[in-house]
Amino acid sequence: SEKNAPEESSSCSKSEIQLDFSLSAAQTTAYEEIHKAFENHNPVLLQGVTGSGKTELHIALAKEALTRGRNVLYLIPEIAVSRQMEERLGRIFGNLLLIFHSKETPARRLEVANAVRRGPYIVLGTRSSIFLPHHDLGLVIVDEEHDTSYKQDAPAPRYNGRDTALVLAKIHGGDAVLSTATPSLESLYNCRIGRMTKVELTEKYYGAAESDVEIIDTSADRRKRGMAGSFSFKL
């Protein structure tokens, strides 16, 4: 239906999925390391600097899972992220892509739940999409795994979406990737004790530009009256 994916997305079967990019050497190495961890039935913590191409790895892994006849859950922390990701994934996965979050209408959420029962699918959603009637999940991706938006304290049920996603993947005999530039302490500890495998991306994707960082001394600007309210003129 129209809201599964962007309007420009076309109908697509799992055998017709075509990537619109190629992996760099660094990404290919990381891809192979991830597969080695999967062979050992270990979830993966993918730590990559901003602009290193983690999303491309997610997409390549999702394509492989769908091609093998299994389904994919791709978690994002906030609804605000969904539109950009929807456009990106929709171009590749077409009508296999299902969107699920609290801003969708109840009727639309029911449609997605029914589509999940039928499969095949890749669900892009916030933490509530964990509770869809998933079957045969081959891959669960938790993007920005450190984000506190994955935790629900109120109302009940109270849960951590990241940790619940790991359990969900295990129940289905699927693989799991937690991805971030700034890992949570829990995930780093799990890597340290061998519960997870850490894979790193330290290079920018195909020479993406480095971010310029400048430290501004606002106390000095205040003394010089170089402030506009709470912001320096440079900001």
Describe each PLM feature range.
Residues 28, 162-235:
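Conserved interdomain linker/interface between the two RecA-like ATPase lobes of SF2 helicase motors
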Residues 50, 81, 103-109, 183-184:
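Short acidic loop-to-helix transition motifs that present clustered carboxylates
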Residues 98-106, 147-159, 221-228:
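Flexible beta-alpha connector loops of hexameric P-loop NTPases
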Residues 70-83, 102, 201-203:
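Short beta-strand-centered segment that lines the nucleotide-binding/catalytic pocket of NTP-utilizing
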Residues 65-72, 94-96, 196-199:
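Post-Walker A helix-loop "phosphate-sensing" segment adjacent to the P-loop in P-loop NTPases
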Residues 87-123, 131-137:
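Conserved motor-coupling elements within RecA-like helicase/translocase cores
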Residues 1-76:
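Pre-Walker A segment
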Residues 128-177:
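SF2 helicase catalytic motif II
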